[in-house]
Regions:
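Short, functionally critical alpha-helical segments immediately adjacent to catalytic or ligand/cofactor-binding
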Residues: 387, 392-415, 427, 455-460, ...
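Helix-turn-helix repeat elements of alpha-solenoid scaffolds
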Residues: 173-185, 210-220, 245-255
Length: 553
């Protein structure tokens, strides 16, 4: 009887957390739901399906055959799914494992295949010339590795490397680590080598390694010769412009930013290049041009603030029919159908269809998503859904939740990312599990699709980040996306410390991980807009926000 009462209570509590007046019929929110192969087979390939395949693979006592069937239903590009499957079900051949784990002395007794498997370039760099010669003499069947070792064994690694082929140079550059790059490659590279590198598919990756390492200043200056290269992408030109700014050459930076603007397709990329053209020239015509942009990002909002122009395309409320919607807001696959359907041919007739589907407060985020697409993002919605939950927090916390949730999920409860982040606040499963333990709550991964639960956990996580980063919205955003440890490591490089000519904008561009860098800017723009809407008695300027971006480390 007690067990039945507990089960009934748990079911009631789950339903209460969903909605005061609604009991969800979503299958995976039902008690004792378990992913099966039959259930998976009915679902289309998507990030959502990959998430549920992961839940299936994590079940106990699963046969290899069934695990393989489920794995092969996936997208094929999901790194998390691949890792889980390989770690749990795919075994390395014993002979290969032996070679991977072998010490240098043990490898000396092995054949050429085992040496090729077990000896990395990084390990080879630490070997004596005698040991290098020993391995070189055993590697005739593996000429690429043999020649790599010959270069490492030479008296002039740099000269031999730059006179080798471009693939080998790239392999050494990426595989041998930061110390090797600083000690051996921090030189003014020959123009012909730079030009060859610029044609490689890994060139932007190469640039990130160079530009974000202040110890590679000589190599950085080698890149100036690309200022007139018309084949480079907008993003490559922009990064080269930042590199020129870091090396105190505003004239060359101007060339790169100008090329970046002309090559850019996305409005945000055009605005970013325009803003930096303004910074390196102080020419107000670039601000004027920025102020005409329809996108509300930190660059355009700041330009409008400096020119005393009020944004005219921010929408905070939307009229609804206020009838109960039949749309299942928890079903990721239903939402995926909407996303696909609105990608093209979104005309008045189709828009009216969604006005008739998304009719209540629960589906307000879904409607504004469609409206933004319909308006080609030239009208931007800063709605405040889930007020019954979020209004209970202080204003700063409300602003942070809305700023992050808008960027993370557009407030869609059923959102699932490629990395399996869930819900309105896009919380990773490992994090939600950890939070449940700290809150001493029973854990059900599917409850993260319920806004009440997901926002509660997101708020808990924000509390820890707010303490670590002094309530600074930009640093909190970096940590929410890239992790607190990564954010601290970036700040400890000296970012957001100086009060230089281009700060804090230069520090904002020196965050090494692209997703985190751009995420922070978007959340900061959201923060500015939401603060001045929800906290209208204490409005804040972007200038003031920028002045507050000072590292606590």
């Amino acid at each position: 009887m007690k067990k039945q009462l507990f089960s009934l209570t748990a079911t009631i509590l789950l339903n209460l957390s969903i909605s005061a007046n609604e009991i969800s019929t979503t299958d995976f929110l039902q008690k004792d739901f378990k992913v099966t192969l039959d259930w998976l087979e009915q679902k289309p390939k998507s990030y959502a399906k990959d998430f549920f395949i992961l839940q299936y693979l994590n079940q106990d006592n699963l046969s290899f055959e069934n695990a393989k069937i489920a794995y092969e239903m996936g997208n094929g590009t999901n790194a998390t799914l691949k890792k889980v499957f390989n770690d749990k079900y795919k075994k390395t051949a014993p002979i290969d494992l032996k070679c991977y784990r072998a010490t240098i002395e043990e490898l000396k007794d092995e054949d050429s295949k085992c040496i090729a498997l077990g000896l990395s370039l990084k390990e080879a760099l630490q070997l004596s010339k005698k040991d290098l010669e020993f391995f070189i003499n055993k590697l005739d069947p593996y000429p690429t590795l043999k020649y790599d070792l010959k270069i490492i064994a030479s008296d002039d690694i740099y000269t031999n490397l730059i006179n080798s082929d471009i693939k080998r140079f790239s392999r050494f550059f990426f595989d041998l680590g930061s110390n090797f790059r600083i000690k051996v490659l921090n030189k003014k590279l020959p123009p012909e080598l730079i030009n060859k590198l610029s044609k490689e598919k890994d060139f932007e990756r190469f640039l990130r390694y160079v530009v974000y390492d202040k110890n590679l200043n000589n190599l950085q200056k080698s890149l100036f010769i690309l200022k007139d290269d018309k084949s480079l992408t907008s993003s490559t030109n922009f990064l080269l412009g930042i590199n020129a700014v870091n090396n105190n050459d505003a004239k060359i930076a101007y060339n790169f930013f100008f090329n970046s603007f002309n090559k850019a397709y996305l409005r945000i990329d055009k605005d970013k290049a325009l803003f930096w053209l303004y910074l390196v020239t102080q020419n107000n015509s670039f601000l004027q041009e920025l102020s005409k942009s329809w996108d509300n990002n930190i660059y355009t909002l700041y330009a409008k603030e400096l020119l005393d122009i009020k944004p005219d395309n921010l929408i905070y409320t939307v009229d609804l029919k206020n009838t109960k919607s039949s749309f299942d807001i928890y079903d990721a696959f239903k939402w995926m159908e909407v996303v696909e359907d609105t990608k093209k041919n979104l005309d008045d007739t189709k828009l009216q269809k969604y006005y008739d589907i998304f009719t209540d407060e629960d589906t307000l985020p879904h409607l504004t998503f469609v409206l933004e697409r319909y308006n080609k993002y030239k009208t931007q919605y800063y709605i405040t859904p889930f007020r019954n939950i979020i209004k209970n927090y202080d204003v700063y916390k409300q602003v942070m939740i809305y700023s992050i949730a808008r960027q993370e999920s557009h407030f869609i409860p059923s959102s699932i990312s490629f990395s399996s982040a869930q819900g309105v606040m896009q919380i990773m499963p490992f994090l939600s599990l950890d939070i449940s333990k700290k809150l001493n709550e029973n854990y059900n991964i599917y409850e993260q699709f319920i806004p009440n639960k997901n926002i509660q956990y997101g708020s808990f996580h924000l509390d820890t980040l707010m303490k670590q980063f002094d309530n600074n919205p930009l640093f909190i955003a970096y940590a929410y996306n890239g992790g607190a440890g990564y954010t601290r490591s970036q700040l400890k490089k000296g970012l957001f410390k100086e009060k230089g000519k281009f700060e804090p904008f230069l520090s904002m561009e020196m965050i090494s991980f692209n997703e985190t860098r751009e995420y922070g800017k978007k959340v900061l723009a959201n923060y500015y807009i939401y603060n001045n809407y929800l906290n209208s008695e204490n409005k804040i300027s972007l200038s003031t926000i920028f002045e507050s971006l000072v590292s606590p480390y």
